[in-house]
C-alpha cells in the first residue's frame, strides 16, 4: 500500500490522465432566454422566443412563446378583444429559425434577416394566456448565405400558423 508521500504527482511536463479525448463534446439541445439573447440581436419588446425546448443542430428547433396581456401590441390589437398579430407570430417563428441558422457550422454569429415568406396561413387565433409552440425545420441552405425553412406554430396541439420562411445572411 502506498502512502501519500509515495504517490508521484505529475511534473510540469506531464498531464494528468483525462478522458477528454474519448468524450465527445456535449451537443446543446435546449436554450434559456439568456442564451437566446446571446444568439439573437432582438430585445424586448421584439424578442418573441422565451426558450428553445428542443434543438437538433443543422435541422430544426422547437421554441416557446408565452403570450401575456402585458405585451405592448395588445393595447391596440384589439382593446376589447386582444389577438396576437399574425405578423408577430411569423416573426416569432422566424426567430426560432434564427437559432438554427446562427448555429450552422461556420455561420456562428452571423446576422440572418428575412428574405421572404411563402404559403403563410393562419389557422387559429392566439390570445393572452396561450403558449405558442413553434417548430422550424431547415429545408435547404445555398451558398452558405440563403436558407429556406418550414415553420409551424401551435397552441394546445392546434395549428395556429404555418408557412415557409426564407433567410439571407447579411454582413
UniProtKB/Swiss-Prot annotation:
SUPFAM superfamilies: Thioesterase/thiol ester dehydrase-isomerase (SSF54637)
Annotated localization: Cytoplasm
Cellular-component GO terms for this entry: cytoplasm; membrane
Highest taxon in the source lineage: Bacteria
Compositionally biased intervals (Polar residues): 1-22
Enzyme Commission number(s) from the entry: 4.2.1.59
Catalytic residues, chain numbering: 77
GO MF term set: (3R)-hydroxyacyl-[acyl-carrier-protein] dehydratase activity
Gene3D superfamilies per the UniProt record, alphabetical: Hotdog Thioesterase
GO BP terms in the entry: fatty acid biosynthetic process; lipid A biosynthetic process
The entry's keywords: Cytoplasm, Lipid A biosynthesis, Lipid biosynthesis, Lipid metabolism, Lyase
Catalytic activity: a (3R)-hydroxyacyl-[ACP] = a (2E)-enoyl-[ACP] + H2O
Region (Disordered): 1-25
Database matches in InterPro entries: FabA_FabZ, FabZ, HotDog_dom_sf
Pfam families, sorted: FabA
UniProt function note: Involved in unsaturated fatty acids biosynthesis. Catalyzes the dehydration of short chain beta-hydroxyacyl-ACPs and long chain saturated and unsaturated beta-hydroxyacyl-ACPs.
Similarity section: Belongs to the thioester dehydratase family. FabZ subfamily.
Name of the protein: 3-hydroxyacyl-[acyl-carrier-protein] dehydratase FabZ
Highest classification ranks of the organism: Bacteria, Bacillati, Cyanobacteriota, Cyanophyceae, Nostocales
Amino acid at each position: 500500500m502506498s502512502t501519500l508521500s509515495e504517490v508521484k504527482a505529475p511534473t510540469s511536463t506531464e498531464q494528468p490522465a483525462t478522458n477528454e479525448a474519448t468524450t465527445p463534446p456535449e451537443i446543446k439541445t435546449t436554450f434559456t432566454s439568456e442564451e437566446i439573447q446571446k444568439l439573437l440581436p432582438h430585445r424586448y419588446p421584439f424578442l418573441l422566443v422565451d426558450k428553445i425546448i428542443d434543438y437538433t443542430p443543422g435541422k430544426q428547433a422547437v421554441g416557446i412563446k408565452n403570450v401575456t396581456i402585458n405585451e405592448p401590441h395588445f393595447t391596440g390589437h384589439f382593446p376589447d378583444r386582444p389577438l396576437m398579430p399574425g405578423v408577430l407570430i411569423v416573426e416569432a417563428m422566424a426567430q426560432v429559425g434564427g437559432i438554427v441558422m446562427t448555429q450552422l457550422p461556420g455561420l456562428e454569429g452571423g446576422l440572418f434577416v428575412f428574405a421572404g415568406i411563402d404559403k403563410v396561413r393562419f389557422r387559429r387565433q392566439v390570445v393572452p394566456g396561450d403558449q405558442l409552440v413553434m417548430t422550424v425545420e431547415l429545408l435547404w441552405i445555398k451558398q452558405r448565405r440563403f436558407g429556406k425553412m418550414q415553420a409551424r406554430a401551435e397552441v394546445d396541439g392546434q395549428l395556429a400558423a404555418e408557412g415557409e420562411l426564407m433567410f439571407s445572411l447579411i454582413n
